Amino acid sequence: MSEEEVVVLNFWPSMFGARVIMALEEKEIKFEYKEEDVFGQKTDLLLQSNPVNKKIPVLIHNGKPVCESNIIVEYIDEVWKDDKTLRLLPSDPYQKSQCRFWADLIDKKVFDAGRRTWTKRGKEQEEAKQEFIEILKVLERELGDKVYFGGNDNVSMVDLVLISYYPWFHTWETIGGFSVEDHTPKLMDWIRKCLTRPAISKSLPDPLKIFDRVTQIIKVHEFFYGY
């Protein structure tokens, strides 16, 4: 490989891995992709690169591993920065803190509520759906009239973090019986705008493939444990 050796360890449905790949693609950084079977036999490379958490994604840059998706995105933004390269986080300390705040909020709220729309049933599922819709409404208000969360010209880390969940929307909507567009139409416009960017559209996993995998998991769970 070239002097800049960049390797990404990932599991294809992961929203956390997707944002790392999008960050690299947005900055036009060449990298080698290595798929990990996180539910099967984890590779020695993953266990050596992330011995504490043993999780994906991992970015290996010139032999040095960087772990945790948002930390990786910030690392990418700091290492590959010049006048020609998109900046994913602002240089102003306050604006940067706000970017981190929203990225962290998305991972805490969207991930948890979305997951419970298909792992829970009855009242708990309804509560999860409402929480999911409410956090999307909060994010829609934060977006306001901007094209992207990062402004009108380019995406930011917040955009990459939130759009990384989009491939899961189909699963959550179908199983939960609701429509994101019915509740947050402007946010869906933002999603469509993001998907016009090649770096984003080619980096996201297939929503139907995710749905198939989730339904398989549900069937296995029902067979062994019931619901």
UniProtKB/Swiss-Prot annotation:
State which Enzyme Commission number(s) the record gives. Answer: 2.5.1.18
Question: Per the UniProt entry, what are the Gene Ontology biological process annotations, in alphabetical order?
Answer: glutathione metabolic process; toxin catabolic process
Q: Which pairs of Cys residues are joined through disulfide bonds in the record? A: none
Pfam families referenced in this protein's UniProt entry, alphabetically: GST_C_2 (PF13410), GST_N (PF02798)
Q: Which family does it belong to?
A: Belongs to the GST superfamily. Tau family.
The encoding gene? GSTU27
Cell compartment(s), UniProt: Cytoplasm, Cytosol
Cytoplasm found in the keyword field = yes
> What protein am I looking at?
Glutathione S-transferase U27
Binding-site list for glutathione: 14-15, 41-42, 55-56, 68-69
**Protein's job:** May be involved in the conjugation of reduced glutathione to a wide number of exogenous and endogenous hydrophobic electrophiles and have a detoxification role against certain herbicides.
* Key words of the record: Cytoplasm, Detoxification, Transferase
Source species, please?
Arabidopsis thaliana (Mouse-ear cress)
